[in-house]
Curated annotation (Swiss-Prot):
Binds 1 FAD per subunit. Binds 1 2Fe-2S cluster. InterPro entries: 2Fe-2S_ferredoxin-like_sf, 2Fe-2S_ferredoxin-type, 2Fe2S_fd_BS, Beta-grasp_dom_sf, Cbr1-like_FAD-bd_dom, FAD-bd_FR_type, Flavoprot_Pyr_Nucl_cyt_Rdtase, FNR_nucleotide-bd. Induction: Induced by KstR. Pathway: Lipid metabolism; steroid biosynthesis. Pfam families: FAD_binding_6, Fer2, NAD_binding_1. It comes from the Bacteria. The lineage of its organism: Bacteria, Bacillati, Actinomycetota, Actinomycetes, Mycobacteriales. This is 3-ketosteroid-9-alpha-monooxygenase, ferredoxin reductase component. Its EC number is 1.14.15.30. The gene is hmp. GO terms for molecular function: 2 iron, 2 sulfur cluster binding; 3-ketosteroid 9-alpha-monooxygenase activity; FAD binding; flavin adenine dinucleotide binding; ketosteroid monooxygenase activity; metal ion binding; oxidoreductase activity. It comes from Mycobacterium tuberculosis (strain ATCC 25618 / H37Rv). CDD domains: fer2, PA_degradation_oxidoreductase_like.
Length: 358
């Protein structure tokens, strides 16, 4: 366990990566390419702990003089199918302490604590046609999905990408290279506010109308995502076809060592957990949350916020009953399908079975 200056001790689930490359994408955005400090044979970070899917994110621990550190989630722009290393892209924001710190101070050789890749903004298959809608730095997870779909799938990919002006376009050269490599499969539609004004729902609807039979992935600032959702609703695109990525600032410290609440007098429940193809049985104190129990047992259960906001810890309840304290992300359809948030679930039955592998 590593001690963190000004913070609680770090948990065993925390990983330390090294910045191998810093790429200036625009005047306001930089990509950070990561490497394992001691190489791929580092026993502290086996390759399975860095496995990820297109559309997922890393949670970074950024130093802070005021609080010791802050935790922020940044989408992976790299693709597990085309890139050797994990990479995230960070864009400056007016009030964004962490993003500004990374843009000002991140340099090659710097080590930074991260959590394992996580997130549910992931296509169920890459062999499909896609409609990808991005604005500003929202291109980051969209780029990962785009590269992966083109490399591994055989379908058509249409990307609508909105920016303030031409100088604000992140990955401009990379998108041109992809369009040249896949001229019959990739269509890129740029929207520049300097020329076209803010993208409205009606304008977006006209542009995306030919592509409404596809899975849709949306990421960008709130007003853009709302306009995109309104456009798709006007076109009667089914809600289950639309996937949206939203990040919230984390209030708790997901890097802190896990403390299992076992203060209750009632006998613990039993949790049977299927994770990465293996089945584990753990004792589950009635007052403890499932995620804390799994992490304390040394299992690499996925998570990010621990606050019920992001959905990264979602798993499927196969048997038994649980009580969720906070749920800001799962919709009724998800609940009907048995999804629960491990970071918010406490047992209500003596035995509970869940799986992360569905």
């Amino acid at each position: 366990m590593t001690e963190a200056i000004g913070d609680e001790p770090l948990g065993d689930h925390v990983l330390e990566l090294q910045i191998a490359e810093v790429v200036d994408e625009t005047d306001e955005a930089r990509s950070l390419v990561f490497a394992v400090p001691d190489g791929s044979d580092d026993p502290e970070i086996p390759p399975r702990r860095l496995r990820y899917a297109p559309g997922q994110f890393l949670t970074l621990r950024v130093p802070s003089e005021r609080t010791g550190s802050v935790a922020r989630c940044y989408s992976l722009c790299s693709s597990p199918y085309t890139d050797d290393a994990l990479a995230v892209t960070v864009k400056r924001t007016a009030d964004g302490y962490a993003s500004n710190w990374l843009c000002d101070h991140a340099q090659v050789g710097m080590r930074i604590h991260v959590l394992a890749p996580s997130g549910n903004f992931v296509p169920t298959t890459l062999d499909a046609d896609f409609l990808l809608l991005a604005a500003g730095s929202g291109i980051t997870p969209i780029m990962s999905i785009c590269k992966s779909a083109l490399a591994e799938g055989g379908g058509q990919v249409t990307l609508l990408y909105a920016n303030r002006d031409d100088r604000s376009v992140i990955f401009g050269d990379a998108l041109r290279e992809l369009a040249a490599k896949y001229p019959d499969r990739l269509t890129v539609l740029h929207w520049l506010e300097s020329l076209q004004g803010l993208p409205s729902a009606s304008a977006l609807a006209k542009l995306v109308a030919p592509y409404t039979d596809r899975p849709v992935f949306i990421c960008g600032p709130g007003p853009f995502m709302q306009a995109a959702r309104d456009a798709l609703a006007a076109l009667k695109v089914p809600a289950q076809q639309v996937h949206i990525e939203v990040f919230k600032s984390l209030e708790s410290d997901p890097f802190a060592a896990v403390k299992v609440d076992d203060s209750g007098d009632e006998a613990p429940a039993t949790a049977v957990v299927e994770l990465d193809g293996q089945t584990h049985t753990v004792s589950w104190p009635r007052t403890a949350k499932l995620l804390d129990v799994l992490l304390a047992a040394g299992l690499d259960a996925p998570f990010s916020c621990r606050e019920g906001h992001c959905g990264a810890c979602a798993c499927t309840l196969r048997a038994g009953k649980v009580n969720m304290g906070v749920n800001d992300v799962l919709e009724q359809q998800d609940l009907d399908e048995g999804l629960i948030l491990a970071c918010q679930s406490r047992p209500e039955s003596d035995s509970v079975e869940v799986t992360y592998d569905e």
